[in-house]
Structures are given as C-alpha cells and as structure tokens.
Amino acid sequence: MSQFWNDKIKSISPYVPGEQPKDKKYIKLNTNENPYPPSPNVIKSVKSMDIESMRLYPDPDVTLLKDEIAKYFNLTREQIFVGNGSDEILAFIFMAFFNKQDKVYYPDITYSFYPVYSDLFDLTEVQIPLDSNFEIKIEDYFGLDGHIIITNPNAPTSIALTLDKIESIIVNNPNNLVVVDEAYVDFGAESAVKLVDKYSNLLVVQTFSKSRSYAGMRLGYALGNSNIIEGLERLKFSFNSYTINRISIESGIESFRDEEYFQECRRKIMNTRDYTTTELQKLGFNVLDSKSNFLFISHITANASDLYQKLRDNGILVRYFSKPKIDNFLRVTIGTDEEMQEFIAKLQKII
C-alpha cells in the first residue's frame, strides 16, 4: 500500500483473472480461450503488416473495422463502437451511462467484473438471485428502477436466455438501458443484435476473444442505437483516442471476412462440447445445459475444490469459484478433441 492511494483504491477488491501459468505447460481449460488459431487470413494479414506504418497512430475512429462489422450485422457505422476488448467497453458503459448512486441490476451469479465496476464507479448494485436451476427468471427484471446488465449466455453457468425472453426484459424497461453481454453467444445462443434497430434502450456487447480466437489481441465491439454509441465515443475521446492498435484493426477486418473458417471453428467446439458432456455424465457429473464454449459441472460425490487441485496436479487447469451457491462447481473450457479426451481420462483415474 502507498500513502498516495486514494480511498477508492484502498477499499476496492479488483477482478481476479484466470490463471495464466508460467511454471510449466498445462492443458489450459480455465479461461475460455479458443483452442484453435485465428483465421489463416488473419495470420496472413499480421505477417504482411507494413512495419513502416507502425510509426503512425492508428485510425482513432476505427472506420474500416466498423464498416466491416456493420456490414456483417446489417447495421450502420454509427451503430458500432469498437474497444480494446469487451471488458473495456463494459467499463465505458458503466462510466458513460450510469450516474453515481444509480441502481444497476444483474444476476447474483454472473460475470464477476460487474460488482467491481459498480464499486469503482460508486453505483448501487442489486444482485437478483438465479433460480434453483441457475436460470434467470425474467419476471424479476420487469419494471425496475435502474439499468440492467445480463450476460447471455450467462457466465459461469453457461445457460442462455431465448431471444423472446431478452426482448421481454427490454420491453418492460423502456426507460432503462438494457445491456446484453454476448461474449459467448456464438456457441449456440441467439443474439439480440437483431433487436438493435427496434429498441433504443438496448446495447449489445460482443468480443473477438472467444469465437474468433483473439483473446491476445484485445478487440471487442458494441452495437446499439446511434445516440447510445455516440455516448461511448464521447467518453473514449475524453479518455484515450487510440485504444485499438493497427495490427488489431487490420487483422480484425480479415476475421470478419472469413465466415467459412469462423463457422467451422464454432461447429468443432460445439461438437466437442456435446462429446464432453456425454462423457462427464457417464462419470456422475451434473452438466448444466451449455450454449457456451465451456461447461459448468458438479459431481454427485466428489468435492469441486479437491477435483480442481487434483486436475491441476495432473497437468490440467480448470476454473474453481469459492463463491456460495457455486462452490461445488467447476467451469471447464472446451478444448480440442484431444485435450478433452485427456481431460476425461484424467477424471476417470481421479473419480
């Protein structure tokens, strides 16, 4: 601690990211990274990058990438915001649209950055309990007196709401901003992007990190009413005009252009997820219905914390949360077929 820390820094509990081990090589199933490389077109773009251009600032408006995203979703450039990963965009949302002491509603079991942002920006967080099946009861979100953030599919539970349920929440909160964080939407859920033109109080956030194998490059984007997007732009240009580097912009464009590769990777991950689910159930695991690139699992007899440590000792990293209600669950990222076969083989010896 330093004498120069302000009161907020002294009191805040920062977000704890998943382990990125440096001591030895593990099968990494703990941070929901894509097991496959980016599109070959992306790799080619990076390798052919004009090094001389690195001395120049990138386009602060990220125009070409916005245009590519807008074309993909049949929106306009003015409806797209691009940030340095979706986490940055979420932080910008908390800063741009929520006043101090505003209420912000989200599930009690969800992305753990939300409480950090609520604390950091002096908001009143209201955590709405999931039901006994770890599902969101949409009626709990009707007619609220504050803004709403929903991760869909939810994390770490992996369960998705249908689009009609998302729309019901939006319709029943006409004066509140409804943010739908869709980091994992490409693995079987239905995106709310198609509702963007219909509702001015909807903001959808997506990322390149999961389905586009871009976690190391840091790219995310938001889609919404042009007036909402303008608010994000005003904040960004009051904070840091150049949040996206040249390599990310140029290669990100190529990622959106290679639809065939994108769909192929999605299919492989979802097929491997189905295989892994079946094998885990044979071993006595309860596996929640996943629409994500990970599984949320608990065993009928084995303790989750013990399983986490035994798997780690056997060279496999998964994610364990000590939070009440989910402290006997593990979150397991879907890797390659070979990685998941090894994961199952280790569990067969451990259980």
Mark where each language-model region is.
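Phosphate-binding glycine-rich loop
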Residues: 63-103, 301
